[in-house]
């Protein structure tokens, strides 16, 4: 069999709070790599503490990409990510470095590695019309309307997920085809890389739950509420009629802090709700990761030497 001459890349996945960011840096230092964030919240400026965003020292130690590239009142799609990540990969490969893609946003990984169907781009006028209808009738009503034209997509979207409801209706109104029909088309532009997929996840769920709880407590101690309050009072967000519909503000921890600052519940309830929501996020991520049949799983506390051996074998073959 001829040698695979495609450039190598590392895909490091895992649930939230599993230690991916530090491992990505360790790999980058050891094998001359650069880190590409695959996280739908790390793209936003000003969301630092609640996202466990790599700090300045971590980002200075090795190059990082696709962090702090959007304002929190802007939208950033999986297609945007795939485009930007490809550009970053090309630049890294040209420098002779190893691309290390790390994060927990499954849709972004799929968009990059498998490609997206060529759906219509965003249409500002249609999007504004849908938002106005939602303000008048509610997102639940629009979810019902979506089910009438695209039952498959509606079944996958919760009635409280305005971003995805809006996009699905937008696709239908712009093209006359449902999102599920578009998604059934063959994907385009698969990534021309030789990829090693690694999953970092504690073997025992209680370990992950402990890490989640400890991390959120540290976030609160480090000023998460002040960070959320600064976002709430920013003129571009404060002027919005429904700021909690912003993708950035729906991030786990941020919505709960916002609602706590609104007086909806106590500090103890804030902690409990945020930890529970983060556990649910981790559960969804683990469910998706189990479908990545070609990925190798590692425990963050016990498999460091095994990770090194797998990396050496992959890069030297």
Curated annotation (Swiss-Prot):
EC supergroup of this enzyme: transferase
Record has tRNA processing as a keyword: yes
Chain sites annotated for binding ATP: 14-21
Complex formation: Monomer.
Family from the record: Belongs to the IPP transferase family.
Region (Interaction with substrate tRNA): 39-42, 163-167
Molecular-function annotations in GO: ATP binding; tRNA dimethylallyltransferase activity
Entry protein name: tRNA dimethylallyltransferase
Gene: miaA
Pfam families named in the record: IPPT (PF01715)
EC numbers: 2.5.1.75
Presence of keyword Secreted: no
Domain of life: Bacteria
Parts of the chain that traverse the membrane: none
Binding site for substrate: 16-21
UniProt lineage: Bacteria, Pseudomonadati, Pseudomonadota, Gammaproteobacteria, Lysobacterales
Its job: Catalyzes the transfer of a dimethylallyl group onto the adenine at position 37 in tRNAs that read codons beginning with uridine, leading to the formation of N6-(dimethylallyl)adenosine (i(6)A).
Cofactor(s) listed: Mg(2+)
Keywords: ATP-binding, Magnesium, Nucleotide-binding, Transferase, tRNA processing
């Amino acid at each position: 069999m001829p040698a695979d001459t495609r450039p190598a890349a590392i895909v490091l996945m895992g649930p939230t709070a599993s230690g991916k960011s530090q491992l990505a840096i360790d790999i980058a230092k050891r094998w001359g790599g650069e880190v590409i964030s695959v996280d739908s919240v790390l793209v936003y400026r000003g969301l630092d503490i609640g996202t466990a965003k790599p700090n300045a020292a971590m980002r200075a130690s090795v190059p990082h990409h696709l962090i702090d590239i959007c304002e929190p009142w802007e939208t950033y799609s999986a297609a945007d990510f795939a485009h930007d990540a490809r550009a970053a990969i090309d630049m890294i490969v040209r420098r002779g470095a190893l691309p290390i893609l790390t994060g927990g946003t499954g849709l972004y990984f799929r968009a990059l590695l498998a490609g997206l169907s060529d759906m219509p781009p965003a249409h500002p006028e249609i999007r504004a019309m849908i938002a106005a209808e939602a303000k008048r009738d509610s997102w639940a009503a629009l979810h019902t309307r979506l089910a009438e034209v695209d039952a498959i997509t509606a079944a996958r979207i919760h009635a409280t997920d305005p971003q995805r409801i809006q996009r699905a209706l937008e696709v239908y109104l712009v093209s006359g085809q449902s999102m599920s029909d578009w998604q059934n088309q063959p994907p385009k532009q698969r990534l021309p890389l030789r990829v090693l997929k690694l999953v970092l996840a504690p073997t025992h769920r209680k370990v992950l739950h402990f890490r989640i709880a400890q991390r959120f407590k540290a976030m609160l101690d480090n000023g998460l509420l002040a960070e959320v309050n600064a976002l709430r009072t920013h003129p571009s967000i404060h002027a919005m009629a429904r700021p909690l519909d912003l993708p950035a503000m729906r991030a786990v921890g941020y919505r709960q802090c916002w609602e706590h600052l609104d007086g909806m519940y106590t500090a103890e309830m804030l902690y409990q709700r945020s930890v529970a929501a983060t556990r649910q996020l981790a559960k969804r991520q683990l469910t998706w990761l189990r479908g990545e049949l070609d990925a190798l799983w590692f425990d963050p506390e016990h498999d460091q030497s095994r990770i090194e051996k797998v990396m050496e074998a992959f890069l030297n073959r």
